[in-house]
Regions:
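Short, structured secondary-structure elements
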Residues: 1-118
């Protein structure tokens, strides 16, 4: 559930339990499969969009869509969390050219940014 936001199917559980492979190797294989899934990308895109407060209130429809699309691209690319955070927190310029800069349109004051970031 943590990786895709969805419970495993009954068939997936049966296959996992029936697999005679070492438990650790079996889990690692499953994690790799889930991280490569479209469900993982969708879940974490939504999770990050929620955490970064992507909405139309400050960004309008196009800005929110562009920021969400940027987040999706980063999740699909499996960008490490520290790099993702750095891209958001150091984003500058036009939100059209650099959608990550939209974060600072949402959180307009340094206090708001600090409270949401820490």
């Amino acid at each position: 559930i943590d990786l895709t936001g969805l419970p495993p199917t009954a068939d997936d559980v049966r296959a996992f339990v029936a697999d005679p492979t070492d438990s650790r190797a079996k889990r690692a294989k499953l994690v790799d499969k889930l991280i490569g899934s479209k469900e993982y990308v969708e879940y974490w895109t939504n999770k990050w969009a929620d955490l970064l407060q992507v909405n139309r209130k400050f960004l309008a429809v196009e800005g929110a869509a562009a920021f969400r699309a940027w987040i999706r691209k980063e999740v699909e690319a499996n960008t490490p969390y520290d790099e993702f955070a750095r891209k958001v927190l150091t984003a500058k310029g036009s939100t059209k050219d650099n959608p990550a800069a939209a974060y600072f349109k949402i959180l307009r004051t340094p206090v708001d940014t600090m409270e949401n970031t820490t």
